[in-house]
């Protein structure tokens, strides 16, 4: 901390107090964001509202169904329903997050739990293979990748004219306990592969993690998988 040069006891004390308050405010005030219509993704709007406001950014959450309604207007989505019996007679209890029969499209939102246990990573791959076997395209949205206009174009091949999530806001922080440090090796490998697909999102998240304690971010471990 740089202390102001003393001119008198009173003026120096006042300057020191103002400087100290400024530093404390910088540490305690969440990242300032402009008013955003679109927030961090949650599987549903109900879960988004339960999660409330993100303490780091002051930004709300937005249910995936609201994003889908803008990306694919006038289409019907089936949420969290068993895949059921297929044309070949095989029956499945697995439940994709969102399924659109008209588009033959399945959209999965993968939260932190999908990166913490190797059996979950394996199960996701197995389920995706089943969906694809029956002619569905599967789009997976990792919790650390937000639906910016560029990401939507990459994932869905759709150009949305209105601004979506701001590309400048990171998705991971030690405070939220959703960093690479909380992932298993299989999850880290998967995370690295997915981040490479979105260089801009990778850059903004890596930059944010660099400013925090590596013990709590696990950035140095993730970087080994990114090589």
For the regions a language model picked out, list residue spans one by one.
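Nucleic-acid endo/exonuclease domains
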Residues: 2-227
